[in-house]
Structures are given as C-alpha cells and as structure tokens.
C-alpha cells in the first residue's frame, strides 16, 4: 500500500515543544539588552500619547521577595500593554536608599568601632551598603523580565535627588507650614528615634491595667459634694501604661458625662455614673452606694493630689474622654499622648516627659531614675501599692503600636521635633478634597481608607534623630536654642547638594562659616554663634518627593503621573506622603489614579513567615519553573485582594502555559510556507475563517480593554479560553483536514493560513505583556517572509487594527445557531461511539432534517458542513421527512439522524468516499487524487 504521508501539508516548525524556560529565559534577557529592545519599544510607540506609571521605590536592603516580585511584574504588564497599545510608557525604576534599616545593618557590621568613626565615614558605609543591594535587586528584577531604564534608575541618595528633597522642604518653609515644637510623637527607644505613623504597626501586647486613686483635698469638694470626707475622697483613673504616671499633670473628664460620688465603707470615690456597676464589680465592692451625681463640667479646675508625688493634678475637660473602658476619668500626661498634649495646650499644663532617648527615666525622677519604661511598670505599681493608691490591678491583651523595624513596643514621648502642619495652608482640607474629586482609587475602598487616615492624622513629624538620611537644613542658635531656616538660604544649600559628589554630605563636611551667612544674627536674641541641625528628614519625605525629583526632571515623563501602583500598605506610606507633599507644594495631587495589590499568602491563605516555614522565594520558583510561570501566576490572580501561591497552584499554571505554548506552536507550524503576498483578503476568505477571526478579534478587543482597566486575571482567562476552547477544541480541530489535505496553494488552504497568521498576531499581542519570554520566542520563529525586517521584537509591533475582522450581528447570530447545531450533531454521534459502532466522527453519515428557516440559514452561511462537523457524509432533508430513528433536537426545527458512512475510507484524508476514480490511486478519494496529481506538475 502506498504511503501518502509525504503528500500531506503537515505542520513544520523548529519552535521547540519543550519550553526549557529556566535555561532559555536568561538568553532572551541578554538578547533584549544587546538589542536595546526596551528603547526600541519606546521608539515604536507614542502614536496615542504618553502614559506615566511612576515607580514607588523599594528599599535597598536585602533580596526581593514574592511581594516585590508581584509588584514589579504588575508594573511591567502595565508598561508593556500600554506601549503595545500605542502609548509611550517609560519605566524608570527607583530605590529608597536612606533610613533606619540600612543604618542598623551598618551599625551591626561596625560594632563598637562605630563610636570612634567620624559621621561622614558611617554615612559612606551606609551608601555602600545601599549600592550593594541596589545592584543585587536590579539583577533580580531584570530576571523577572521587567523592562525599564535599569542603567539610569532614580535613587533617593543621588545628589540631584537629595537637592530636590531640600528644595521641597524649603517650599513648605516658605509657606509657613513647617513648625518646630515639643510634642508627643511615636518614639522607638530601641532604635532611639522618632517614628512616623507609617513606621508603626500594631500587634497584640500584654499590658498591666490598674485603677489608681488620686486623693482630693481641694476645699471646693465640699461645695459640690457636701457629704464627702476630704481625708478619704479620691478620683479614680484607669491606665494600661503605669510607667507614665510619674509624668501625670491632670485628670480629664468629659464635660457632658455624669459623675458619681460613691461611698464604700469609709472611703469616697468619683467615677463616671454609667460605669459604676462595671467598676464596682471589678473592685468587688458589694455594698457601695451612690451619694450624689454631678456633670463633669462641675468638677473642672478642682485639684487632686498626685498618687506618687507631693504635687497637684488638675481636673480638666476633654472631648477625647469616652465611656468605652475604665472610669471615665482619664490620667493625663501631656508628654506621653497626643490627646493629653492638646488638653495641656488649653490649660497651660507642663508638657513633661522625663525620659532619655533610650526610654530611661532621667535622674530627676524620684523613685524611678535610670529605669527603662519596659522595666518600670512593676516598680511603679509596687510604689503605688506602698502608698495605698491601687484599688485593683490585672493584665489585658490589646493591640499596641510596635516599631516597624525592630518590632519593639513604642511609646509616645514629647521631644522637640520638626513638623509639617496639617492645618496651615489647609493641607488637610485640600488633601481630603483631592482624594474625593481628583483621584481614581482602584479598588474603590482605597479612597475611604486613605481619606480616614488623613482626616484623623496629627501633624507630620518629619524629623529623625539618626545619621543616614537627608539633613534638615536649619541653623540653631547656640545662645537661645531658636532655629533659623530662611527658604532662600535653604535653596542655596540645596544647590551645593546637587554638585557635591556625595550630595548632602556637604552639610556635614563643609566648614560652618561656609554654611552660615556672613553676619547672621539670631532674630530672637541677636546671638551670632550657630550650630547645624543634626536631625535628618523622615524617609517618607524622601520617597514622597519623587514626583519632583523624577517626574518633573526626566524626559518622557511628566507631572502628575497617570498611575501609582503599590501594595495596600502604601495608603499610609508612599501614596500618603506623596499626596501631602504634592498638595502642600503644588496644590494638586501627584497622580490621577492609585492601584493597590494585596499581600502574597500561602496556599491556605496564611501569611508567610519563617517561623511557620511557609515562605517561598521568587528565586525558588524561577529555578524550578521559570519566571514565565511566575508572571502567569501574577496575571491569573485577583491581585486586589491577598493572593495565594503554592506548588499546586503553580503546577496548574504550568499546564495552562503548556496549552498556550502548544497553540502557538501549532499556528507557527501551519504558516511555515505562507508569504505576505499570499494573504487572502478577509471578504474572500472561507466562511469559517471569517467567523473565527471575528471570535478572536472580539476576544482580543476585550483583552485590550482588560489591560486598560488593569483586570489582568480577565486577560489570563480569556487568553487561556481562546487557546483551549475556541482554537484547539473547535477551529483548529476542524481545520486539520483543510490544512493537511488541500492543495498546498489552494484558496482553501491559503484562507486557513491567513486566518492563522492573523490569529497568531492577535495572540502574540495579547500575551506579550504577561508571557513576555514566550511571545518573544514565538515571534522569532515566525517565518521571515511574514515579518518586517525593521521589527526585530514582538514589543515593536504596531497596534493591531481588528475592525475588518468583525462580522455583522446577523451573520454572527447565524454562526451561533450553527454551532448549536454542531453540538446537537456531536451529541447524536456519542451513543454510537460508546457502543463501539464507530471509532471517530469521520465514520458517520449525518442527515439533518431541518425546517425551512434553518435550511435558509445553512445555505446562506455557505460553509462546508462536513468539515465543520468533522463527518464524512452529510445530507440536508426537510423536517417533514424525518425518519423514525432521527433524534429530536433541543433546537426548534431540527432532527438529527446518524448512520455509518457509506463507501471506503480514503487512505490520505480518512474520509469515507467513493474511491479509485483514477486507477493509479485506487485508495484515494477524488479530492485527494486531484491534489496528488497536481503535485506532479
């Protein structure tokens, strides 16, 4: 028997079936770099304008983790998709290089040597440390397949950048928004520095909780409570921070609450009326009784006695007093709480905070000198018990602020700090207005989150008592301690930062006479001796100034950005500081839209932690699966919530990837002999080919819309469904006969190849932002006869216009009906297959019994129904002539009869036909005979 395999047009491509991603990806990255593909992509785009995504700088410390990989890949998808849609979209990566984590690492490395080293040398070691990890992270990000200006990133420690930071501060000073005062702020006594709200995280903590008597000897007591005994009456407070009691200055009540005088045996106490029952139960006072009730405002100004010292504690009023816990009488230490501080300002109380930077009581503190606050609680409680001041004590577990870096509990401590006022120049009001009116928040709940944060936040403490950062450019009078920071002078200092090889190191290295203006006298005391301010700026001011240092300075960028894209924790971080600085200095927000993603958790939804042993690194995934699978994972999840990852999840994505890759390989294999001048005009293509182009073009359009709306998981599902359902399971399955057995130059085959060519281009453009390595690899294997010599990369392809592929609604509706008929035919065939009467649908003869309207539809579509249904023989008969064995269909006006095909099976196409019309080819059908004969010519 003759073998006709050589006469078939079988797929032919050298595109490898096995991806070999781990080995192949680095080769592609090297090729991208050698051929400047990122730059060429930018050159090829821009017809529709520009799109600006501004990179939030990761911290230059340690290796990247899955969270940073998720973030960078999301940004890369945005950048590539926008460029391929015709928008020039540059990606300038950045790094946050100053701050405590780096300084602490350097301190660990230096050990005791740090004490003997000059500040400039320590700063230089910090810079080297940041540079080291910047280089490490840069290579790790490039390994993710992320395009960008990797040779020209922005760094917050660049001299120009440090200069801009100082200029932004000068703008605030110019507007009168910067104040220096003694206020209680978050203080980490382990790190010995002030903290911003963004540097504080909450965790469960066990605290001592005590009810404390403050004796009242004020003679006014008898005027309000005639029954009270001045020798045994107290007002009772409840506190979970006993260590702050040495700093007590007052007791706060709510003016509108009722307060009761209670008698228990020979003792009298004052607490809020609504809390009497709860408190008595906690005190185990069964026989106590209410003597009299008055309002809080009636007690204002009365003097109590401090429970530890021979001093007074005034009764004051405050709206912050609630009835949620305690006694309704609030211990007030203005040096250790923002609400206490506000009350102190109204009543002219001393803002007393007798602690050093390490959280130890000063030598002037009686009983507790030298004790650290975390050691002080039991000692304070013991002393209170000695004085019989405690009614009841226990412990509670509650959410308590901790340092983001060292994880230690933090305290409020009043120190002299620099602040940006939230009220001056209406910074708070303008920011809240912009949040509501000028910015799109994705997802929408981000709006309420940042709005509430800014609505309730205190003034921004911008000073830090550390070394590694941008100095606060100000002079301090040696005589009176007042500061001088004229904005014009600050701007001149900033100019020196810009030209100094190590930027703001100029502040520390320059001679004092080169910094202090000649003849400068203190406006307050006329002193002429000055010293430099030693505090540095909050690193959130550094990164928050990036719009000024990057967007307003770099070519191809601009202000404001179209998009900021970071993790949801940045509502209190970079989004927050950037907004305040931009509103404060420009009057407008720095971004049009803010997109946030969640955290990466394990397959069970648990937070990843080393202690749980469930941490997965990007490097592990890349070395096992290749980064393409990691990128596919990013696109497959709804990243706006926390996203799960596990080996099982990744394995499923490997399978999905394989299907997409195999689809591309099949398309490549079947256009290997096609040339551009052989492309068939769409209107002249076979009906089925026109239909599939409509299907793919519609999906392609939806995918592009999903890229624009950042719905990348929709892109993944549409792309995967297109490859598996619309193409592999439907169109490509039908097409095999026409592609393999038709004449090599026949219209039918060229029509099919034309469709495959266009489909491949739509697939490539759909997948390239996500599956960048595979798309590039596929593009390289497209025959040169089908490519523009000047377009060397898939990322240089122009935007693909699909309008000519779209069918009108009537034809599309006809096809939808025809596919329903196809499904009915397949269902009717299945019983014969199960019985073993046939092995393949080609073994069947189908009779369609149709009503007139269906008959008209079938004729109008003018398609080969045998090919569409993958059967050998098909007849169309009037429904009225339906045989008794015809299966009734779910479609009105249709019945289907299935029989074995008549005749013999063609050796070449496997369809049942009358064979041997040409005696030279006794086993071929007439169609195959003609094709084989023509091959001789």
UniProtKB/Swiss-Prot annotation:
A motif ('HIGH' region) lies at residues 58-68. It is found in: Cytoplasm. Its cofactor is Zn(2+). GO terms for biological process: isoleucyl-tRNA aminoacylation. One of its GO terms (cellular component) is cytosol. A motif ('KMSKS' region) lies at residues 607-611. Monomer. Catalyzes the attachment of isoleucine to tRNA(Ile). As IleRS can inadvertently accommodate and process structurally similar amino acids such as valine, to avoid such errors it has two additional distinct tRNA(Ile)-dependent editing activities. One activity is designated as 'pretransfer' editing and involves the hydrolysis of activated Val-AMP. The other activity is designated 'posttransfer' editing and involves deacylation of mischarged Val-tRNA(Ile). Belongs to the class-I aminoacyl-tRNA synthetase family. IleS type 1 subfamily. This is Isoleucine--tRNA ligase.
């Amino acid at each position: 028997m003759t073998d006709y395999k050589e006469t078939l047009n079988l797929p032919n491509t050298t595109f490898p079936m096995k991806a070999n991603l781990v080995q192949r990806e680095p080769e592609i990255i090297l090729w991208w770099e050698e051929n400047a593909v990122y730059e060429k992509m930018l050159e090829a785009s821009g017809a529709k304008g520009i799109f600006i995504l501004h990179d939030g700088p990761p911290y230059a410390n340690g290796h990247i983790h899955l969270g940073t990989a998720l973030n960078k890949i999301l940004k890369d998808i945005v950048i590539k998709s926008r460029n391929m849609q015709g928008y020039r979209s540059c990606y300038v990566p950045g790094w946050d290089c100053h701050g405590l984590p780096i300084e602490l690492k350097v301190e660990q490395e230096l050990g005791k040597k740090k004490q003997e080293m000059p500040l400039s040398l320590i700063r230089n070691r910090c810079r080297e440390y940041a540079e080291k990890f910047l280089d490490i992270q840069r290579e790790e990000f490039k390994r993710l397949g992320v395009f960008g200006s990797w040779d020209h990133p922005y760094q917050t420690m660049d001299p120009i950048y440090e200069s801009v930071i100082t200029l932004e501060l000068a703008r605030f000073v110019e507007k009168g928004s910067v104040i220096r005062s003694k206020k209680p702020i978050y203080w980490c006594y382990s790190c010995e520095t002030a903290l911003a709200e963004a540097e504080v995280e909450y965790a469960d903590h066990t605290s001592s909780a005590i009810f404390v008597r403050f004796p009242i000897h004020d003679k006014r007591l008898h005027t309000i409570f005639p029954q009270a005994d001045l020798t045994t009456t107290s007002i009772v407070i409840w506190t979970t921070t006993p260590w702050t009691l040495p700093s007590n200055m007052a007791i706060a009540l709510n003016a509108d609450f009722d307060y009761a005088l209670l008698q228990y045996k020979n003792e009298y106490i004052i607490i809020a009326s609504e809390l009497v029952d709860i408190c008595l139960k906690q005190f185990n006072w069964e026989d106590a009784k209410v003597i009299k009730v008055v309002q809080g405002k009636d007690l204002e100004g009365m003097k109590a006695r401090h429970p530890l010292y021979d001093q007074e504690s005034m009764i004051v009023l405050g709206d912050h007093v609630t009835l949620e816990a305690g006694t309704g009488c609030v211990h007030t230490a203005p040096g250790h709480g923002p609400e206490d501080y506000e009350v102190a300002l109204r009543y002219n109380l001393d803002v007393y905070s007798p602690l050093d930077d390490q959280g130890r009581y000063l030598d002037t503190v009686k009983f507790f000198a030298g004790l650290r606050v975390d050691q002080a609680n039991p000692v304070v409680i013991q002393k209170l018990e000695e004085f019989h001041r405690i009614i009841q004590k226990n412990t509670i577990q509650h959410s308590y602020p901790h340092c983001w870096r060292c994880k230690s509990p933090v305290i409020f401590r009043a120190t002299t700090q620099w602040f940006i006022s939230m009220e001056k120049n209406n910074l708070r009001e303008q920011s809240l207005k912009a949040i509501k009116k000028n910015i799109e928040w994705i997802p929408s709940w981000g709006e309420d989150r940042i709005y509430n944060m800014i609505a309730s936040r205190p003034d921004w403490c911008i000073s830090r008592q550390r070394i590694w950062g941008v100095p606060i450019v100000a002079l301090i009078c040696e005589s009176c301690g007042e500061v001088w920071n004229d904005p014009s002078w600050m701007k001149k200092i900033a100019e020196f930062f810009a030209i100094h090889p190590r930027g703001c190191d100029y502040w520390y290295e320059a001679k004092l006479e080169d910094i202090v203006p000649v003849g400068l006298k203190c406006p307050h005391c006329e002193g002429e001796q000055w010293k430099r301010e030693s505090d540095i700026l909050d690193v959130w001011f550094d990164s928050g100034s990036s719009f000024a240092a990057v967007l307003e300075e770099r070519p191809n960028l601009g202000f404001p950005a179209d998009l900021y894209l970071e993790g949801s924790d940045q509502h209190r971080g970079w989004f927050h500081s950037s907004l305040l600085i931009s509103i404060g200095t420009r009057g407008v927000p720095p971004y049009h839209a803010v997109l946030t993603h969640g955290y990466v958790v394990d397959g069970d939804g648990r937070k990843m932690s080393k202690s749980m042993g469930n941490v997965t690194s990007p490097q592990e995934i890349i070395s096992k699966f290749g980064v393409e699978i990691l990128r596919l994972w990013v696109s497959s999840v709804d990243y706006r919530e926390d996203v799960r990852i596990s080996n099982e999840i990744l394995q499923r994505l490997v399978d999905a990837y394989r299907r997409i890759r195999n689809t591309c390989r099949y398309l490549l294999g079947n256009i290997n002999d096609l040339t551009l001048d052989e492309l068939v005009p769409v209107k002249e293509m076979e009906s089925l080919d026109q239909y599939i182009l409509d299907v793919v073009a519609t999906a392609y359009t939806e995918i592009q819309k999903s890229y624009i709306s950042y719905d990348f998981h929709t892109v993944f599902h549409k792309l995967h469904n297109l490859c598996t359902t619309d193409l592999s399971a439907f169109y490509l399955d039908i097409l095999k006969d026409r592609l393999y057995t038709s004449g090599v130059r026949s219209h039918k085959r060229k029509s099919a190849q034309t469709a495959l060519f266009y489909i491949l281009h739509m697939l490539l453009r759909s997948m390239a932002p996500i599956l960048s390595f595979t798309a590039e690899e596929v593009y390289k294997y497209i025959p040169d006869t089908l490519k523009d010599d000047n377009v060397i990369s898939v990322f240089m392809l122009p935007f693909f216009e699909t309008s000519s592929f779209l069918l009108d609604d009537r034809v599309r509706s006809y096809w939808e009906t025809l596919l329903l008929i196809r499904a009915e035919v397949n269902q009717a065939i299945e019983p014969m297959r199960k019985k073993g009467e046939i092995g393949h649908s080609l073994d069947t003869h189908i009779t369609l019994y149709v009503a007139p309207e269906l008959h008209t539809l079938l004729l109008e579509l003018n398609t080969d129904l045998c090919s569409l249904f993958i059967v050998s023989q098909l007849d169309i008969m009037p429904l009225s002539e339906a045989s008794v064995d015809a299966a009734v269909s779910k479609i009105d006006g249709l019945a289907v009869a299935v029989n074995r095909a008549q005749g013999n099976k063609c050796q070449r196409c496997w369809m049942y036909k009358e064979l041997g019309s040409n005696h030279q080819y006794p086993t071929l059908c007439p169609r195959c005979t003609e094709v084989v004969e023509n091959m001789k010519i």
